[in-house]
């Protein structure tokens, strides 16, 4: 659900940053140890041995603090989503000790009961929310089936859905008290490995092979009492600590962080982590009316109440935090004045776009434009050579006339026919798309045929001997009928002459 990469910007949410120092480091070891044991049992159909379990425990305890904090950040993000929006502020204030404990209600499941979540990625075991709260903030080693051992305080008004850690307790039964005495007594006389019996216990055994009374209690875990108490009280932000200071984060005033120390450098994130970050952002947009406490003086990198630009960051585009904290990112570092102007522009719900054909991932602030400016700039250096420029307004008429000027003139004046009667030469239309074709072959040599030239007078006036029109030429033409005035120009074959129904003709009269 959340990015498995290093701490991305969605994991710097003020909700997470305020609660992260209060998470016990033992929670990471405990949840992962239970998952390892369950996976081993499903694969080998037998329980993990003490040596193997102890090796897994030592491996988890020696894990890097950054890995533990990333896991805690993802789990806190899941818990934030399961807490009702109107109770999230109270949850942060009560856990951090800035407000008396009050009920914090969670979103119920379909049956109206406490929800269950998986605390690890791709885990098949689910845990109740109240169990997770107790393990996470109190470090109590509870199993996933210990939900009935939890009790709510009398001050809790809604025991069914309240996930306030200060309202949740663990009931200790008589068996627990009874076993605690013997286990503690055995632990005080033994080393850090309670499963290894001491020499005194071996000597006290009867000769007939029966075990002593104290040896009937077998410690199933690999933690001793003192070790368990010690590791359960260690916060997850202790030890070597993270590579950033939690007090340097931009947040609201109720986090009691210094407003002057609001500068930190974010690790550079690739476009892949930005794309995956959008998936986690979508889960936070389904709860309207949330974040009533994000209206402080400073603006958190993950807060989405003051500007919608945090939810609208596209892959490959710099977020407001990336533009401000660009010491380690791929973008060039802007000046303080440019940083303030860019931050103001982001709060006005503008989305930056990198325009122009020369835009590169390493863009400077001068290439960042907003929708108020023209999107399309002047053309770049591409296709600027005059030899390869092409204007769509130019036609191929000049090209045809250049290749075969005679054919171009004949094609525009006389239509010649092939033996099949289909037209090949037509008048060139500059408005129609002309394909790039070779010039047509020259027309066949036709025998000169005298074309009848009609008189300007009707045929009846020529028989009456009337005077001809002065503008009409005086030719002696044989008398022909009007039907024979349609003449076809074709090859020398006489069968194609004067056959109007088979060829294309022009009216010359």
Curated annotation (Swiss-Prot):
Give the modified residues of type Phosphothreonine.
Answer: 471
Give the compositionally biased regions (Polar residues): 498-509
Pfam families to which the protein is assigned, alphabetical: CTF_NFI, MH1, NfI_DNAbd_pre-N
Q: Which SMART domains did the record assign?
A: DWA
Q: Where is the composition biased (Pro residues)?
A: 435-457
Q: Where is the composition biased (Low complexity)?
A: 189-199, 259-275, 296-309, 329-341, 469-482
Query: At which residues is Asymmetric dimethylarginine found?
Result: 389
- Gene Ontology CC entries for this record: cell junction; chromatin; nucleoplasm; nucleus
One BP annotation, GO:
regulation of transcription by RNA polymerase II
A GO molecular function term, named singly, is: DNA-binding transcription activator activity, RNA polymerase II-specific
Query: Subunit composition?
Result: Binds DNA as a homodimer.
Q: Which family does it belong to?
A: Belongs to the CTF/NF-I family.
Q: What is this protein called?
A: Nuclear factor 1 A-type
Origin species, per record, is Homo sapiens (Human)
């Amino acid at each position: 659900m959340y990015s498995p990469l290093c701490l991305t910007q969605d994991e710097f949410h003020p909700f997470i940053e305020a609660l992260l120092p209060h998470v016990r480091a033992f929670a990471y070891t405990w949840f992962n140890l239970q998952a390892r044991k369950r996976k081993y049992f499903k694969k080998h159909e037998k329980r993990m041995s003490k040596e193997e379990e102890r090796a897994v425990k030592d491996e988890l305890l020696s894990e890097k603090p950054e890995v533990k904090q990333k896991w805690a950040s993802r789990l806190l993000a899941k818990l934030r989503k399961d807490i009702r929006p109107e109770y999230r502020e109270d949850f942060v204030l009560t856990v951090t000790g800035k407000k008396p404990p009050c009920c914090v209600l969670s979103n119920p499941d379909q049956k109206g009961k406490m929800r269950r979540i998986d605390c690890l990625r791709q885990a098949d075991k689910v845990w109740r929310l109240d169990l997770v709260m107790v393990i996470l903030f109190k470090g109590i080693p509870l199993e996933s089936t210990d939900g009935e051992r939890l009790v709510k305080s009398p001050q809790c008004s809604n025991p069914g859905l309240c996930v306030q850690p200060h309202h949740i307790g663990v009931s200790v039964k008589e068996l627990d008290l009874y076993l605690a005495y013997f286990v503690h007594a055995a632990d005080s006389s033994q080393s850090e490995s309670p499963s290894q019996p001491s020499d005194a216990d071996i000597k006290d055994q009867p000769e007939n092979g029966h075990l002593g009374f104290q040896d009937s209690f077998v410690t199933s875990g690999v933690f001793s009492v003192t070790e368990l108490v010690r590791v359960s009280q260690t916060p997850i932000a202790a030890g070597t600590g993270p590579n950033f200071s939690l007090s340097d984060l931009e947040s609201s005033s109720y986090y009691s962080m210094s407003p002057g120390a609001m500068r930190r450098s974010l690790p550079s994130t690739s476009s892949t982590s930005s794309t995956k970050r959008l998936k986690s952002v979508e889960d936070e947009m389904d709860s309207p009316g949330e974040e009533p406490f994000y209206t402080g003086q400073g603006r958190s990198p993950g807060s989405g109440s003051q500007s919608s630009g945090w939810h609208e960051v596209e892959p490959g585009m710099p977020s407001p935090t990336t533009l401000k904290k660009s010491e380690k990112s791929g973008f060039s570092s802007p000046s303080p004045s440019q940083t303030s102007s860019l931050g103001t522009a982001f709060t006005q719900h503008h989305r930056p776009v990198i325009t122009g054909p020369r835009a590169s991932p390493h863009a400077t602030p001068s290439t960042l434009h907003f929708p108020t400016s023209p999107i399309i700039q002047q053309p770049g250096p591409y296709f600027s050579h005059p030899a390869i420029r092409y204007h769509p307004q130019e036609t191929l008429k000049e090209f045809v006339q250049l290749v075969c000027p005679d054919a171009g003139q004949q094609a525009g004046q006389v239509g010649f026919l092939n033996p099949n009667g289909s037209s090949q030469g037509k008048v060139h239309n500059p408005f129609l798309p002309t394909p790039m074709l070779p010039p047509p072959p020259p027309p066949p040599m036709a025998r000169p045929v005298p074309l009848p030239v009609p008189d300007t007078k009707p045929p009846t006036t020529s028989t009456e001997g009337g005077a001809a029109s002065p503008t009409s030429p005086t030719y002696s033409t044989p008398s022909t009928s009007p039907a024979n005035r349609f003449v076809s120009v074709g090859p020398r074959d006489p069968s194609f002459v004067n056959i109007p129904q088979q060829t294309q003709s022009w009216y010359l009269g």
